[in-house]
Amino acid sequence: MALTQERKTQLIQEFRTHENDTGSPEVQIAILTENINNLNGHLRTHKKDHHSRRGLLKMVGQRRNLLTYLREADVQRYRSVVDRLGLRR
């Protein structure tokens, strides 16, 4: 299922760093994580959907790059995002 506008707004409000923030790494990582989780559920039922699998791998790579950037820029913000999203178990 695609990410609804309400859920996206909710994620932005939860992870933003200031009032008008929609593009900070934290927000982007949260939205990508939500999309990745949704696509994982889709791929569990549609195992042969290789086009979607390629999109999933692209999103995972993009999230990894954003996490690397955030870790190098500010370790505290990185740890906060990882803990809040439940990544890196």
From Swiss-Prot:
InterPro entries for this protein: Ribosomal_uS15, Ribosomal_uS15_bac-type, uS15_NS1_RNA-bd_sf
One Pfam family here: Ribosomal_S15
Keywords per UniProt: Ribonucleoprotein, Ribosomal protein, RNA-binding, rRNA-binding
The keyword Cytoplasm is annotated on this UniProt entry: no
GO molecular function: rRNA binding; structural constituent of ribosome
GO cellular component, one term: cytosolic small ribosomal subunit
GO process terms (BP): translation
Family (UniProt): Belongs to the universal ribosomal protein uS15 family.
Quaternary organization: Part of the 30S ribosomal subunit. Forms a bridge to the 50S subunit in the 70S ribosome, contacting the 23S rRNA.
Role, per record: One of the primary rRNA binding proteins, it binds directly to 16S rRNA where it helps nucleate assembly of the platform of the 30S subunit by binding and bridging several RNA helices of the 16S rRNA. Forms an intersubunit bridge (bridge B4) with the 23S rRNA of the 50S subunit in the ribosome.
Matching HAMAP family: Ribosomal_uS15_B (MF_01343_B)
Protein name: Small ribosomal subunit protein uS15
